[in-house]
């Protein structure tokens, strides 16, 4: 048992492989697990085990994602790999598997391709903070100059989408060659095979270049209100799950969204009918609020540390629109479409005022299955921040999912 306890002392980081179809994302994922399995720090996974990704549902959308876990000397990782391009788009937009950093896989034989570009853009828009590049299939390219050109092209593309193209580590290797060596000799250690060493080199880069994320408990307090009731003689209680941060009795919080923002003091905290000194991220709590009437709080508001979040009505977002087969709309929609936007705990009506495609063109309409950037105007202000996820609903069913990329008003 001591061992399991020791493992939990390592910081946990969520990563994933992104990049164009057939550039070797899944092969690389398999190579990483097999390489680290030789150190007893992962369970080796075959390509077909990862490729047969289980279905998940996130914000009403079915996504195929495979999760593997492994550790290095420094950290414990959860790694997500999606089989299809559409699954990546959906996963990144819904945040089904939130990534603290990603490994961008680019085939040296092909260079950056359309999905390479799209995944970099998505990573930027949905807030994946850092990328490391694995230049794969270098065994198929004899020309050093060609490799340097491909690297240059990748760095320019990264810079174009506001990643630090000049400093991002690019590791050259061959996931397939490393995998073949590990399959031939599963005990291969560092220093025994040049291709396997490239996998170690990649993991060193991931360890050092992708920062350890700030834990949710260390972020400013936020709780979306799910329910409200009053306790005779004591006041009004708002219940919900603490999304981030921590809260103690006596602290000041703001009620944000739907109405004028107002301040109040926490006079009591309860969890499972017991009083609590401090609530932390992940707890489902009841918060007793001083001087607030039951009719002044409603579902859809948030309780937050003062001055950390503000109410807004207009924003830009990256959106995936569900296909008919996914339970989405059967017909396209046009600018002026007015669905519900489900944010945290509530639906708010809003108008989609305009949309643009990736290349900056303005399509006349949005078809089921499309990914677009859209500008939204809500009829009521609610607490919104960049990187926040939401669902688009119509008559109670999900027709799209999105992430806020920019606040306008």
UniProtKB/Swiss-Prot annotation:
Catalyzed reactions: GTP + H2O = GDP + phosphate + H(+)
Predominant localisation class: cytoplasm
One GO term describing the cellular component: cytosol
Region (G1): 19-26
GO function terms (MF aspect): GTP binding; GTPase activity; translation elongation factor activity
Region feature G2, mapped onto this chain: 60-64
Compartments, as annotated in UniProt: Cytoplasm
Keyword annotations of the record: Cytoplasm, Elongation factor, GTP-binding, Hydrolase, Magnesium, Metal-binding, Nucleotide-binding, Protein biosynthesis
Functional summary from the UniProt entry: GTP hydrolase that promotes the GTP-dependent binding of aminoacyl-tRNA to the A-site of ribosomes during protein biosynthesis.
Protein name: Elongation factor Tu
């Amino acid at each position: 048992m001591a061992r399991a306890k020791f493992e939990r002392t390592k910081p946990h980081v969520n990563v994933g492989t992104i990049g164009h179809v057939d550039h070797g994302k899944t092969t690389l994922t398999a190579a990483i697990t097999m390489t680290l399995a030789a150190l007893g720090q992962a369970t080796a996974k075959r390509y077909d085990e990862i490729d047969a990704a289980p279905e998940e549902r996130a914000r009403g959308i079915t996504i195929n994602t495979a999760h593997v876990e492994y550790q290095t000397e420094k950290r414990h990782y959860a790694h997500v790999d999606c089989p299809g391009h559409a699954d990546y788009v959906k996963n990144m937009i819904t945040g089904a598997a939130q990534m603290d950093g990603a490994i961008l896989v680019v085939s040296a034989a092909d260079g950056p391709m359309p999905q390479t570009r799209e995944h970099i853009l998505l990573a930027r828009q949905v807030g994946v903070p850092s990328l490391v590049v694995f230049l794969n299939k270098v065994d198929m390219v004899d020309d050093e100059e060609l490799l340097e050109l491909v690297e240059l092209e990748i760095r320019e593309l990264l810079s174009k989408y506001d990643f630090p193209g000049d400093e991002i580590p690019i590791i050259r290797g061959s996931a397939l060659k490393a995998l073949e060596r590990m399959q031939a000799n599963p005990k291969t250690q560092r220093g025994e095979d040049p291709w396997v060493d490239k996998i170690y080199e990649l993991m060193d880069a991931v360890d050092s270049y992708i920062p350890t994320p700030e834990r949710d408990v260390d972020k400013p307090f936020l709780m979306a209100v799910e329910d409200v009731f009053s306790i005779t003689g004591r006041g009004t209680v708002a219940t919900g799950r603490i999304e981030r941060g921590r809260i103690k009795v006596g602290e000041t919080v703001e009620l944000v969204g739907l109405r004028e923002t107002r301040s109040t003091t926490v006079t009591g905290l309860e969890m499972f009918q017991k009083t609590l000194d401090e609530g932390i991220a992940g707890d489902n709590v009841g918060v007793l609020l001083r001087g607030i009437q039951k009719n002044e709080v409603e579902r859809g508001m948030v309780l937050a540390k003062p001055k950390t979040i503000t109410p807004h009505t207009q924003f830009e977002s990256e959106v995936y629109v569900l296909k008919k087969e996914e339970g989405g709309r059967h017909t396209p929609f046009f600018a002026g479409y007015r669905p519900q936007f489900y944010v945290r705990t509530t639906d708010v009506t809003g108008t989609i005022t305009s949309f643009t495609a990736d290349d900056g063109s303005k399509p006349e309409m949005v078809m089921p299955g499309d990914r677009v950037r859209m500008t939204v105007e809500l009829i009521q202000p609610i607490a919104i921040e960049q990187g926040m996820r939401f669902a688009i609903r119509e008559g109670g069913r999900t027709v799209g999912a999105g992430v806020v990329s920019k606040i306008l008003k």
